[in-house]
């Protein structure tokens, strides 16, 4: 038997207009229903080709199909983190608490310094991609990353806990080519409760995956 499970588009945890005025409804609808859904369909299409190849029904260009899967799967995962990483104004925004705040203070010298560095990373991603705050299970520290496309420069082992999409489809209808203003306004909808939960999960579960049994 040859069979792979398929991916599904997750629902948003809020209405499409919930992040206004910082991200308008039109962007959210297009981004979720069209762009994210395209990555789900792309990942599933790659899996279907691999299934048919294994069954002997077709021959595939393995390299091309694997590249398609990597790109689309990563796009699906990044967006699946991105949506709950945000919350409507009043629930989102402000500053973090808990372990996230402690690590930011210890590593970056305070929230404002962290925010400035993360913002600079997101604003200067070459081409299209993501700004990422990830947990390093080996050192139990936070890392700021620039990810190009969805899967280029993503470092194996690091666990994303906060991401911002800086592909043009995430902001162009509202901010045109002003990525910087989009990034600055995005901080008003960051869901720090979600980030804290992701950090706790990573602290509890990620480290054993990358260390040899004692």
Curated annotation (Swiss-Prot):
Keyword Transport appears in the UniProt entry: no
GO molecular function: identical protein binding; metal ion binding; superoxide dismutase activity
Cofactor(s) listed: Mn(2+); Fe(3+)
Annotated binding of Mn(2+), by residue: 31, 79, 165, 169
EC numbers for this chain: 1.15.1.1
Transmembrane parts of this sequence: none
Catalytic activity from the UniProt record: 2 superoxide + 2 H(+) = H2O2 + O2
Record: residues binding Fe(3+): 31, 79, 165, 169
UniProt entry tagged with the keyword Transferase: no
Sorted UniProt keywords: Iron, Manganese, Metal-binding, Oxidoreductase
Pfam families with a match to the protein in the record: Sod_Fe_C, Sod_Fe_N
Protein origin, superkingdom: Archaea
InterPro entries listed in its UniProt record: Fe/Mn_Superoxide_Dismutase, Mn/Fe_SOD, Mn/Fe_SOD_BS, Mn/Fe_SOD_C, Mn/Fe_SOD_N, Mn/Fe_SOD_N_sf, SOD_C_sf
Entry's cofactor comment: Binds 1 Mn(2+) or Fe(3+) ion per subunit.
Enzyme class: oxidoreductase
Function as written in the Swiss-Prot or TrEMBL entry: Destroys superoxide anion radicals which are normally produced within the cells and which are toxic to biological systems. Catalyzes the dismutation of superoxide anion radicals into O2 and H2O2 by successive reduction and oxidation of the transition metal ion at the active site.
Family assignment from sequence similarity: Belongs to the iron/manganese superoxide dismutase family.
Name of the protein: Superoxide dismutase [Mn/Fe]
Source organism of this protein record: Aeropyrum pernix (strain ATCC 700893 / DSM 11879 / JCM 9820 / NBRC 100138 / K1)
């Amino acid at each position: 038997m040859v069979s792979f499970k398929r991916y599904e588009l997750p629902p948003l945890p809020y209405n499409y207009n919930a992040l206004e005025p910082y991200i308008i409804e039109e962007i959210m609808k297009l981004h979720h229903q069209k762009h994210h859904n395209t990555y789900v369909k792309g990942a599933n299409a790659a899996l279907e080709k691999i299934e048919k190849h294994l069954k002997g029904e077709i021959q595939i260009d393995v390299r091309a199909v694997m590249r398609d899967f990597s790109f689309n799967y990563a796009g699906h995962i990044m967006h699946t983190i991105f949506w709950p990483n945000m919350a409507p104004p009043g629930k989102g925004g402000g500053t973090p608490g808990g372990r996230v705040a402690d690590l930011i203070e210890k590593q970056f010298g305070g929230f404002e310094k962290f925010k400035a560095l993360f913002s600079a990373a997101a604003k200067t991603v070459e081409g299209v991609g993501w700004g990422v705050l990830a947990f390093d299970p080996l050192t139990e520290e936070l890392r700021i990353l620039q990810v190009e496309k969805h899967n280029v420069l993503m470092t194996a082992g690091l666990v994303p806990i906060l991401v911002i999409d800086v592909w043009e489809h995430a902001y162009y209808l509202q901010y045109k080519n002003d990525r910087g203003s989009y990034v600055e306004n995005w901080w008003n909808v960051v869901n720090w409760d979600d980030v804290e939960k992701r950090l706790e999960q990573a602290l509890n579960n990620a480290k054993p995956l990358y260390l040899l049994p004692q």
